[in-house]
Amino acid sequence: METKRRYKMYKVKKHWVTIAVASGLITLGTTTLGSSVSAETEQQTSDKVVTQKSEDDKAASESSQTDAPKTKQAQTEQTQAQSQANVADTSTSITKETPSQNITTQANSDDKTVTNTKSEEAQTSEERTKQAEEAQATASSQALTQAKAELTKQRQTAAQENKNPVDLAAIPNVKQIDGKYYYIGSDGQPKKNFALTVNNKVLYFDKNTGALTDTSQYQFKQGLTKLNNDYTPHNQIVNFENTSLETIDNYVTADSWYRPKDILKNGKTWTASSESDLRPLLMSWWPDKQTQIAYLNYMNQQGLGTGENYTADSSQESLNLAAQTVQVKIETKISQTQQTQWLRDIINSFVKTQPNWNSQTESDTSAGEKDHLQGGALLYSNSDKTAYANSDYRLLNRTPTSQTGKPKYFEDNSSGGYDFLLANDIDNSNPVVQAEQLNWLHYLMNYGSIVANDPEANFDGVRVDAVDNVNADLLQIASDYLKAHYGVDKSEKNAINHLSILEAWSDNDPQYNKDTKGAQLPIDNKLRLSLLYALTRPLEKDASNKNEIRSGLEPVITNSLNNRSAEGKNSERMANYIFIRAHDSEVQTVIAKIIKAQINPKTDGLTFTLDELKQAFKIYNEDMRQAKKKYTQSNIPTAYALMLSNKDSITRLYYGDMYSDDGQYMATKSPYYDAIDTLLKARIKYAAGGQDMKITYVEGDKSHMDWDYTGVLTSVRYGTGANEATDQGSEATKTQGMAVITSNNPSLKLNQNDKVIVNMGTAHKNQEYRPLLLTTKDGLTSYTSDAAAKSLYRKTNDKGELVFDASDIQGYLNPQVSGYLAVWVPVGASDNQDVRVAASNKANATGQVYESSSALDSQLIYEGFSNFQDFVTKDSDYTNKKIAQNVQLFKSWGVTSFEMAPQYVSSEDGSFLDSIIQNGYAFEDRYDLAMSKNNKYGSQQDMINAVKALHKSGIQVIADWVPDQIYNLPGKEVVTATRVNDYGEYRKDSEIKNTLYAANTKSNGKDYQAKYGGAFLSELAAKYPSIFNRTQISNGKKIDPSEKITAWKAKYFNGTNILGRGVGYVLKDNASDKYFELKGNQTYLPKQMTNKEASTGFVNDGNGMTFYSTSGYQAKNSFVQDAKGNWYYFDNNGHMVYGLQHLNGEVQYFLSNGVQLRESFLENADGSKNYFGHLGNRYSNGYYSFDNDSKWRYFDASGVMAVGLKTINGNTQYFDQDGYQVKGAWITGSDGKKRYFDDGSGNMAVNRFANDKNGDWYYLNSDGIALVGVQTINGKTYYFGQDGKQIKGKIITDNGKLKYFLANSGELARNIFATDSQNNWYYFGSDGVAVTGSQTIAGKKLYFASDGKQVKGSFVTYNGKVHYYHADSGELQVNRFEADKDGNWYYLDSNGEALTGSQRINGQRVFFTREGKQVKGDVAYDERGLLRYYDKNSGNMVYNKVVTLANGRRIGIDRWGIARYY
């Protein structure tokens, strides 16, 4: 058995005395659990006080386990959490004697002279060694003298301070494994980087292994190493001229090269440098030890190193010597190759490997829950360090919702958008920038005139890109320009001739556009979403994401800018445009999902290789051709049938719905092409007049339906001259109008009595109609002429109604339709019938540029491109060539406005989808429309030809105006930046905060921006002064044409996306927290670079621990990281701090060895927990994300982590034992009640339904508790079991009454049939209770037993009469014979009652007993008392015959059928 002993260490001044005592306790102070100590008795220890030799002292000073002394500074900064006793009790297992002195004394110089520690490779000089030994001996002598005198006092002090020792065995979660102690978490694994407070002592469990670690020992070697050597005078910078050091705005960067005073020619001879002799700064200097180690190991890989692997434990002097070896090899190779490009490549590659110089220190979220499309954004801020980039503006998120900075519209309760979308984010609140945006818009609209001297090549209208990501002032500026330049507010014709649209997703945008009398049309995004969810989403049973499931059809009528219900259709209308898919909507999101799910799970799906894209489209295109789709959208033709037939909206047709999104332009038709082509051409001929939409809820045959939704939507257009169904119209009305009939239920089955009545209007009574589209099991069939559908003609009745039943309408599932679609049109229209209406020459009285009208309805926009068209393989495949060749096709579809792809030459930086596929949205020079080279769509001339061809066919052309961002500018500027999310909010724990950062913000002054930037402002100011005189809303300023932007600079931007340069690419000395810059007499560089004396390392100056950087500067008011990755803070006196600290407005914690807790929990004595984040700041007053933003915790004002049920900001939430907020989950509380916490907010669900992972539904009341029993909610009745689960599709007994709750909604079933598990049928009446007895339902007479079961194939006696109900239908049988199971026959009369007595049926005289049984082969007395006999087979009365009865008696029957016994 191992012997347990306790080791006490007594502190005498600055020296420690170790004593062994048998013990089972530990108080953590300043010794390690594995300390090298002797297991002698206390008495022996006290008698053996010796002084270590100076050589041992030196070794101790260089040990990584150097004792951390208690300094005056540390004591004043202590808190309860880190107070230390001077006596340390250690519990450990001793298995062998360890050679050691019983008392170890360490000398520290009282003056501020420090000793430079030398590596074994370079021994200190004899003189320095002697001095050090003398100093150590003196200190040791003093300690020895004091030790005996103070030992007794120290023991007494230790006993007092050790009243609360730590018993590791008593801590429930602390377990000893292989001689080490670990804290075992709830998951059964050791917790790592975890601190625990026990009896006022802090136990720390290692961040790598989780083992309990002694925090009394420093993690670094003490001592200074001189940085100056024989190379230093030669490697110093030759002078401070700009040509001698590569900088950005005078700041030095990680890949900077400089001109040294001398070069080591051929690796042998120091030779004065020339102006061309530049060398990488990283050849002779490194910002810290860890970077130098990485450099040396990297150079080993390049064949330029020593071959030795260097680690954090390598001495500084050994690293310096190795760097000299590398320099020799570099210079040798330069002499051999006579060039340095190879070295630049190596250095550039090395820089990218270092965390401080790459995205590892940029809080990149690309792989998790992204807070920006490119993984992160940087906001520029004003600073004296970068005054040239300062701005008075950068007013963020001034969207239409919040143009003044405060929300004005609340249809959409969000902020309505955010500023940081992509790349260099333009500051559109800056008046100079606003003027430049106007200049560019004018250039774009007049491109043909300006560049080609050809007005026919000008654009007519504009699509404003990303409205919710730019300053809303731009919308007003653009509207002002369109009004001034084209007079779009002067007449409807002008407006339509220059049709412009907004990519505006927020529901607040249309109202803003109306209030500001905008010259562009908004999206009806409400209707778009309604169509998406009602038609294209999967059924709930097929959906992997239960938030993305198919809804009913009702929102298609009412959830729109223009309500089309009977009650809402005459309300105020708003002009708009509508689409179901677009180049960047419902396409790239699907492709991203496929890539992430099936090809490359490490990508976000928005950055990919072209090969990955090709693989994704193979899956995408195959899925589109499946009936049951996994990724792509269902019912695309149905969406077009509704959009194209709608009144009060312009449809935008999307290229990708007609052709495959990938492949060469127009090469491959989509599976929807024929149906949409038919609808487009039919719209020209038929879509006119008033409109009515409604939903008919058929009863349906639910026993054969997977989904019990029975709504069938009908949309009718009456034709010109008929605005209502009752209008007579004119002769022209007869051949106009159309009906769309649709269901979104692929399992829909009408019952035999269901009817769908479509009122085509009085103008169309007794008129023949034909199908335009019909759904079959294989897809949609198009009928493009009357003759093609002649056999299917159907006539309206005298009310003008078309009537459809189960033989016409049912659900289908095929690649084109998931549900049902039919379109009907009147017979007799001429081939050239065109119901479209010309625009008026009058202005709208309201002052609105666009108002809903027949002329506006007559327009059709074609978004004629896809993001994902392949790059051409031959010139003839260019998009713009194909457009010019196919204008007649577009015209036949009714296209009036062709929206072209953005024609800008694309950036090829590959940083985001747009620049990978080069779709034109990622540009570096926005004035370059295929001018410097071909864009993806063709040459400049191809574009001009396409525009002119469209114009020649009467089709206007819409250009894409993208005022939000500019990609990949060639010039860099150093800016002051902070890592933010897309709203410009600081990302907690990001290292980049008011940090100097090199961004790509400058254009080169030689591009088209230089030629055309600001070039037209003077002309525009003279022509349209009103634009320049308007005060803009967001900034209160007029646009400023005085400054022409011929070159972009940081001052014109809000910021950029993270660029992968890291927090430290712009170099600074972390110790002094000052950036290196070349600035004349204010130049600040590493000391050794100017041949000044410099040393580096940690050293105690007698008052505390200090640090000197690898640039030779002392750390003050700064954080420092050692080579092992530990962080420390040095105060304004340059001393290391300990314990709980308040620094820069944040609370932080430092262990007793100075190591800062980072990404670490500290569990307090009361069990509460604090967390110190990535920067060591204690989390408080908010929610914080963990695990790549996938989980959340909450910390209160004191930094305590929430656990259990908590009320935060008025919301009840639940946090598990690890502090993670529970979302989308059920929790059973200590009261046994179930509660659900929302999957989005995490708030406890109240007054709403929620479902569990098994698909069971519950209803949570106002207390968040699941209801049980029968409940009436929002006027509907439901039933919940005692476990809270909603009963669906089941029959239950409630207070003795049978009730049925629908399988889909769970509502109490009324007026409906339902079956139980035994296939017994029930009918539930208007009160929801199962009926009993005789019932007439839907005109059918049925019978239900007392238990509610429908009687089928049985006889029932009630009201004294026998009745029989059909075995299949259950209907009461009338006027027919039926037999019972014993073979007895009955005849049911016209009332369904069994006849009795003598009866004449079908010419036969028969007889039935009082029970209704027919008499056969026997006698009976009739109502006159006469005996009669009835044939045993037919039952007919017998005449003139002698018969022997079954009982053996004989009877004779006369000619009148009267029988007598013999």
Swiss-Prot record:
Pfam families: Choline_bind_1, Choline_bind_3, Glyco_hydro_70, KxYKxGKxW_sig
Biased composition (Low complexity): 71-85, 134-149
Reactions performed catalytically: [(1->6)-alpha-D-glucosyl](n) + sucrose = [(1->6)-alpha-D-glucosyl](n+1) + D-fructose
Consequence recorded when altering residue 1080 to R: In strain: MT4239
Outcome after substituting residue 328 to F: In strain: MT4239
GO biological process: glucan biosynthetic process
Top-level lineage group: Bacteria
Consequence recorded when altering residue 313 to N: In strain: MT4239 and MT4251
Effect of residue 688 to S: In strain: MT4239
Disulfide bonds listed in the record: none
Assigned GO CC terms: extracellular region
Function statement: Production of extracellular glucans, that are thought to play a key role in the development of the dental plaque because of their ability to adhere to smooth surfaces and mediate the aggregation of bacterial cells and food debris.
Miscellaneous comment in the UniProt entry for this protein: GTF-I synthesizes water-insoluble glucans (alpha 1,3-linked glucose and some 1,6 linkages), GTF-S synthesizes water-soluble glucans (alpha 1,6-glucose). GTF-SI synthesizes both forms of glucans.
Name the UniProt record assigns to this protein: Glucosyltransferase-S
Gene that this sequence comes from: gtfD
